[in-house]
Amino acid sequence: MSFSPLIRQLIDALRTLPGVGQKTAQRMALQLLERDRSGGLRLAQALSQAMEGVGHCRQCRTLTEDELCPQCADPRRDDTLLCVVEGPMDVYAVEQTGYRGRYFVLKGHLSPLDGLGPEAIGIPQLLARIEEQGSFSEVILATNPTVEGEATAHYIAQLLTNKGLITSRIAHGVPLGGELELVDGGTLAHSFAGRKPIAL
């Protein structure tokens, strides 16, 4: 089926979203145009406002509408802990754990094949933040448990050696409520390697 230029433009724009392929983009576009024009206009307005008004926190680099995000602006947070994550969504995930320290958001992970080296993801800015803040006693590396995430954590840990900081890595393993037979071998290996004695 051949679409008009404006419909084609809408479909192509929707395909830029993660996980949205050609067919899904077509369904979304036609749904908005045929059945939910007011929803489409709200979406366009919200998207336009977000693109104009949302930037990056000057301290941790997460997404925010203000100069400082709510976490960096909160004076009650623990200034001795710094959690390093790969992206803004990770901040929201870590917040759900009750973590009350500070954050630094990388722009992804090291991936030489994709041209993402230390500068591209913000490692020099991370080191500068640690140096300037001066109050951190522990840096928690909460990068994803992928090959690239592990490499990124290892690289940062090496850079922080001899800086007088505790450098820790979040644990990876069997999810709470998970069944061992359903857990992949790599995750199970991490669980065994990170096992701890039971305190009675």
UniProtKB/Swiss-Prot annotation:
Q: Which gene encodes it?
A: recR
HAMAP family the record matches: RecR (MF_00017)
**Known role:** May play a role in DNA repair. It seems to be involved in an RecBC-independent recombinational process of DNA repair. It may act with RecF and RecO.
Q: Which PANTHER family match?
A: RECOMBINATION PROTEIN RECR
Q: Which domain of life is it from?
A: Bacteria
Entry keyword annotation includes ATP-binding: no
The record's section on InterPro entries has:
DNA_Rcmb_RecR, Rcmb_RecR, Rcmb_RecR_Znf, TOPRIM_dom, TOPRIM_RecR
Protein family (similarity comment): Belongs to the RecR family.
GO molecular function terms attached to this record: DNA binding; zinc ion binding
| ZnF locations on chain (C4-type) | 57-72
Per the record, the GO terms for biological process are: DNA recombination; DNA repair
In what residue span(s) does the Toprim domain sit?
A: 80-175
- According to the UniProt entry, the coiled-coil residues are none
- From which source organism is this entry? Pseudomonas fluorescens (strain ATCC BAA-477 / NRRL B-23932 / Pf-5)
UniProt keyword list? DNA damage, DNA recombination, DNA repair, Metal-binding, Zinc, Zinc-finger
Q: Which residues form the signal peptide?
A: none
Q: What is this protein called?
A: Recombination protein RecR
